[in-house]
Regions:
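Extracellular/periplasm-exposed beta-strand and loop segments of Gram-negative cell-envelope proteins
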Residues: 56-63, 98-131, 163-175, 181-200
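Cleavable N-terminal export/targeting peptides
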Residues: 1-37
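Short loop/turn motifs that connect adjacent beta-strands in outer-membrane beta-barrel proteins
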Residues: 28-41, 77-84, 145-152, 167
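Surface-exposed strand-loop-strand hairpins of Gram-negative outer-membrane beta-barrel proteins
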Residues: 50-71, 222-224
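Residues that define the transmembrane beta-barrel architecture of outer-membrane proteins
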Residues: 39-41, 62-70, 130-136, 150, ...
Length: 242
């Protein structure tokens, strides 16, 4: 009996030592493979309608105000899920707001930015106020088909910009009856009334290389106390590729 017990104990010790010397290897966690030909949407061009939130009734807008943006983006896919990525870029964003029979005093020495209705006197029929920014967008992106880039795509993000130009363009000088006086074009430029930095929320949703986009500016267009507290927003078509 003692011999049998001794043999069992020795066998148990031998098995224990063997298990310690050859621990069970855990399988490595597999990571998703990022396709070598992944569509990265390096170039993004946007054309849309733009407007101001908070615009007072005293300011008369007309026509189709537009937004034009162009960015070069770098795309960093998640190793654990190539359908998700972070896009970071640099480019130019511009807004073009149109007014009718309104004097836009961009170069005036007044303490506030003046928008004056001149329909009852000589006036320019059309005035365009254009602002341009050097912008750095960042997006959280999703694509349903990262290999071809032809499936559903979505992106949410923010963009930070610094003002590089603000100017007005006035055309078709008329009298109050609408009769043309002169066809000359008057341009004026000044950044005095404008906030130098803008921060905007952005979104894109679409199929393949064509998407709908929207943007809303968190920061006010004009400096505090320089005019109405308006915030630009835009919606339009976004083209992306490469």
């Amino acid at each position: 009996m003692k011999k049998i017990l001794s043999v069992c104990v020795c066998a148990l010790l031998a098995f224990t030592l063997s298990a310690q010397e050859n621990p069970e290897k855990k399988p490595k966690k597999k990571t998703a493979q990022v396709p070598a030909n992944r569509a990265n949407d390096h170039f993004v061009v946007q054309l849309g309608y733009t407007n101001w939130s908070g615009i007072p009734d005293s300011i008369t807008k007309s026509g189709l105000s537009k937004s034009i943006n162009a960015y070069f983006m770098l795309d960093y896919p998640f190793k654990t899920n190539p359908k998700l990525s972070i896009g970071i870029g640099l480019g130019i964003g511009s807004d073009h707001i149109t007014f009718t029979k309104t004097y836009v005093g961009i170069k005036d020495l007044t303490p506030t930015f003046q928008f004056t209705n001149q329909s009852d006197t000589n006036h320019f029929k059309k005035t365009k106020l254009a602002t341009s920014y050097l912008e750095a967008p960042i997006e959280l992106r999703f694509t349903s088909d990262p290999s071809t880039g032809k499936g559903f795509k979505a992106a949410l993000g923010v963009k930070v910009g610094t003002l590089i130009n603000a100017h007005t363009r006035n055309t078709k000088f008329q009298n109050k009856a609408g009769t043309s006086i002169n066809e000359f074009v008057m341009k004026e430029s000044s950044k005095r009334f404008f906030n130098k930095t803008r921060i905007s929320a952005t979104a894109r949703f679409g199929i393949g290389h064509i998407s709908l986009y929207g943007a809303y500016q968190f920061t006010a267009l004009l400096k505090d106390g320089s005019g109405p507290e308006v915030r630009p927003y835009s919606i339009g078509i976004s083209l992306s590729g490469l």
